[in-house]
Amino acid sequence: ATSTSTVGGAGSNAHSAYASATSSGANSGYYAGGGGGGRGSNSSGTGAGAGGVGGGGQGEHGSGQAAGTTNTGGGGGGGSGEFNGSAGGSGIVIIRYAV
């Protein structure tokens, strides 16, 4: 059976651990993580939650809890039954330059 799933909400992790570790000093940059993927349907199917705005956290259902790429702010997708969710959205990259 084909199932549908909701789309992830807007990003909520405004300042990730990676951001905290790299956002000081001249010419520094950091990745602002966002929300995780939407929760998939409880029944098996092909639907998968999309990552929230800004990427960020993990999917909220079972096998969909795949983390995004390290240090990029990318988020995991929501699961759908026994299927893995799709990849989350991209993170927001902020770079500061000395003037």
Label every PLM stretch briefly.
Residues 1-99:
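Low-complexity, glycine/proline-biased repetitive segments and flexible coils/loops
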